Amino acid sequence: MAKNGTGGMGGSFLGKVLAGGVASVLCLIAGSAAAEVQTVRFARQLGLGYLQLYVAQDLKLVEKHAKEAGLGDVTAAYTPLGSPSAVNDALLSGSAEFAAAGIPPFLILWDKTRKSADVRALATLNSQPAYLNTNKPDVKSLADFTEKDRIAVPTVKLSYQAIILQMAAEKQFGEGNYAKLDNLTVSLSHPEATISLLSGKTEVSASFTSPPFQYQQLESDKVHRVINSYDVLGGPGSFSALWTTAKFRENNPKTTKAVLAAMDEASAFIKENPKQAAEIYIRLDNSKLAPEFVEKIITDPEIQYSTTPQNILKYTDFMARVGTLKNKPATWQELFFPELHDRAGS
């Protein structure tokens, strides 16, 4: 009796210890998952350069990969913004966890935050040409612009288009003359610039934009192309990227990997389903463009949707040389988080 009683007490005590240990482990596991954010907010610019984010939003790909990673029900929210400066402000103010814009705005933020927020890119989004279009028949090259002209870019001196214009100006006017046309630039979102250029009734006589807006502009017989960014770069190069802070990645490792997986899946979806991707873009953007028109752009061989960087150092070499960047990366990996380092980037 006594033996059985003692054994019962011991078994009960041991059971409680084991149960408590298991409960503690479960709490730790649950706590680890709960420690990561339950809402992931994306601030992005406008246009087909960010098509993966449109697709991820519509197909709930971030939510899918977060759940597969054991994070439970995570919500992804997407906010379109008209300029890269607004996108970067959203990230730094804590209004967004991820920012998506052109490569040069990312590089400038990387340069400025190396000893603070330590912003780096998680992935690129696509490689696509950007066109400088004009409604002035007599403008055949950059040398034909006058002081009366105004060139619309998303953000002066900061946006992808503004930096490419500087690179083109140096090629046109000689080394050191990269800022020769800066005084002609004005900040306008792509939709606003397109409306202004097509109307012909504003000071804007040229628009440096991106797909689909540049092709929409060229539908008018009064508009023609002056330069193509690929000609300036000497070939294709990444146009846009997705970035965040080192702190967010450190505190949310599973979420970060889920976002990258979502972008990879969205890239594959676009390649395999361009028609559906075009329909998603039109619906989410409330665009009046024809689905066939957008699909034709998406399937243009010049445009590639990929999370792997392409010719990133062409931007950094120029921007460091002219003083826009104080720090010049030796490799593209310095600009990206380790999740991307084993890919065949450039």
Write out the residue ranges for each language-model feature:
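Short, surface-exposed acidic
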Residues: L71-A76, G176-N183, D285-I297, K326-W332
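Secondary-structure end/capping motifs
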Residues: R249-K326
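Short, glycine-/small- and polar/acidic-enriched structural segments
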Residues: E36-Y178, N183-S187, K201, S205, ...
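N-terminal signal peptide c-region/cleavage motif recognized by signal peptidases
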Residues: I29-S32
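Soluble non-cytosolic domains of exported or imported proteins
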Residues: L81-S85, A100, T155, S159-I163, ...
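Conserved C-terminal helix/tail region of periplasmic/extracytoplasmic solute-binding proteins
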Residues: M319-S346
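Bacterial N-terminal signal peptides that target proteins for export
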Residues: A2-G21
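Pocket-lining segment of extracytoplasmic ligand-binding domains
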Residues: G174, D182, P191-R283
